[in-house]
Amino acid sequence: MCIRDRGKILQGAVKQYDKLKHLPSSSEVMIKSIQMHDDDMKEAVCPARVGLSLKGIKPDEIQRGDILTIDDSLEVKTELLITFNQSPYYKGEISDNQMCLINIGLQIKAAKISSRSPFKLILEKPIICKKNDTCLLIKQESTTVRIIGSGKIN
């Protein structure tokens, strides 16, 4: 088994031969084998860190933040409307067309603030999320506080 990387089970369990959907590609994959701490397993449960051998996708098609799921409520989006709360410690201006980073879970993507009311972001690359996920907006080039604020996805 060739393990190039590993991931964490965030909810539930995975079993050998389970069929899951890879996001953002929407490819169907099957778990051929599971490894935990160099031991082969038939099943792994949350919050285990695992290595998976997958059928239906190549290792170079998987990136940090990608998700394997059976949950149909997860969506792949390039535009987000959020309920935004600016950090009281961030003193910079927030303007339309301003670039920032958005963080949801382990995913960090570049985004442009399209409008402030309603607060809309246009992402350079797709992000995986569901309604009411918490997100963090970051201004990477800031010399003081980098966290612009947080929000919930509408």
Feature-to-residue mapping (PLM):
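C-terminal effector modules of nucleic-acid-centric enzymes and ribosome-associated factors
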Residues: 58-154
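Conserved catalytic-core segments of large NTP-driven translation/proteostasis enzymes
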Residues: 4-71, 78, 82-84
